[in-house]
């Protein structure tokens, strides 16, 4: 095949694929956009991922998943304001969804909305009081909100549930934050190496 034939074949291929793509509504391309966005995330090309998640979100069938992943990518870029705005409609539509509520709470906390995040983490904990992840998240946010005594008392009550190695590691990290953040006389009765 010579150069002229290759060029003609390329034009024919371009015209042929363009003809079918033009007749295809953009929302039906949502699966491809979603997959492209995911691939861009894997390549750490977050701006492109954001663009394709937004395109995928135009299709109602992909809206929730694309919007959630868009917010996640915003978080990876430390764009917490956009992440909060992306997650808020999802949370408003389904506040009982623990995955969305936890992501929204984390974005709020990272954006500096500590009071709102604390309320959400408290609600998440109250829904599932034996979930060690929820216990540790709530305790960590209490420390972040400078509610140190409340955090110590809460951890003392829940310590018996925190027996897994990872839970103990996170607990020790929270205790270190308490010790670093609070004058010793304020927590002397609450925190000791043996007590927590």
Swiss-Prot record:
UniProt keyword annotations, A-Z: Cell membrane, Lipoprotein, Membrane, Palmitate, Signal
Annotated lipid attachment (S-diacylglycerol cysteine): 22
InterPro entries from the UniProt entry: TPR-like_helical_dom_sf
Coiled-coil portions: none
Lipid-attached positions, N-palmitoyl cysteine: 22
First and last residue of the signal peptide: 1-21
Membrane-topology descriptor: Lipid-anchor
Protein name per Swiss-Prot or TrEMBL: Uncharacterized lipoprotein TP_0449
Biological source species: Treponema pallidum (strain Nichols)
GO cellular component: plasma membrane
Localization per Swiss-Prot or TrEMBL: Cell membrane
Primary site of residence: membrane
SUPFAM superfamilies: TPR-like (SSF48452)
Source superkingdom: Bacteria
């Amino acid at each position: 095949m010579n150069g002229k034939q290759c060029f003609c074949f390329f034009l024919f291929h371009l015209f042929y694929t363009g003809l079918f793509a033009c007749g295809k509504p953009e929302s039906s391309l949502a699966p491809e956009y979603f997959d492209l966005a995911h691939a861009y995330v894997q390549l750490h090309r977050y701006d492109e991922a954001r663009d394709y998640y937004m395109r995928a979100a135009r299709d109602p069938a992909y809206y929730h998943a694309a919007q959630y992943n868009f917010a996640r990518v915003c978080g990876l870029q430390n764009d917490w304001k956009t992440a909060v705005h992306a997650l808020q409609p999802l949370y408003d539509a389904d506040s009982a969804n623990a995955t969305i509520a936890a992501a929204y709470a984390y974005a709020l906390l990272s954006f500096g909305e500590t009071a709102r995040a604390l309320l959400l983490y408290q609600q998440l904990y109250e829904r599932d009081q034996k979930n060690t992840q929820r216990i540790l998240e709530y305790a960590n946010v209490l420390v972040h909100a400078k509610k140190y005594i409340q955090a110590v008392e809460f951890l003392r009550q829940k310590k018996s549930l925190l027996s897994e190695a990872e839970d103990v590691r996170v607990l020790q990290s929270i205790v270190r934050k308490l010790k670093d953040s609070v004058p010793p006389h304020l927590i002397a009765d609450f925190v000791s190496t043996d007590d927590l």
